[in-house]
Amino acid sequence: MPAAFFTCVVALWIPLWILGARPQSELRNLLPFNLPISALTALCPGVAAVALAFRAGNGRAARRLISHAWDYRRAANRWYAAALLVMPGIMLLSYAAMRALGRSLPEANLSFTDATLLIVPFVIGAFGEELGWQGYAFDPLAGRLGVRLAAVVLALFWASWHAIPFVETGHDADWVVGQTIATAGLRVIIVWLYVGVGGSVLAAIDFHAMTNVSDFMFPVNGYYDPFVTGILVLLLAAVALRVMPRGATRRNAP
């Protein structure tokens, strides 16, 4: 049930949030790219989903949940392509917009090797999140609220959770607000891809991982303005929300 899932996720998050908030904690230096220890909360939705699935149906249900996350649907190749290419495209447009606005930007230093090294940890993190958000929580939520409203509710919850790690990375208030708003839009896009593919968690994982890779590669280790990027994300999210089915789909009907 969605309520049990969200409660379990928050219970798993709290200790990591507390650890990440300790300014003198040596744990703050364990993760790369200035990530706070609270970034490990990315694994919490998946852990909560597997635990609840195991409780409901023992090991078979948990294995089914995990295997569903890698369910590739050949007929939906265009959706998988969108999942991989949409966010790099948004970041390129964001870079062009910042150039046009006269923003001071470092020279782009894109490295295929760096991008390849980033993919593995970000796929692991995306798997941990999307196994819970889309693989476990979304369908029951959409069955109750309809696809559009479920997308908005999940987006608000997800963005609120991200705000704490954003603060713990030391960014100023404007950056945190802009990034949090953009994050809500990203979840709506993830739901759009998930529904478009016909309930593929793999599409959600692909988009989520490429979002993080694109952010850190722009153009040097995440040097971007979340308000500029956020406007582009919200525009696409608004279109995605408009074309989504209003009510429950056949997959998530109660």
Where are these regions (language model features)?
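Membrane-interface helix/loop boundary segments of multi-pass membrane proteins
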Residues: W13, G128-A155, V195-S200
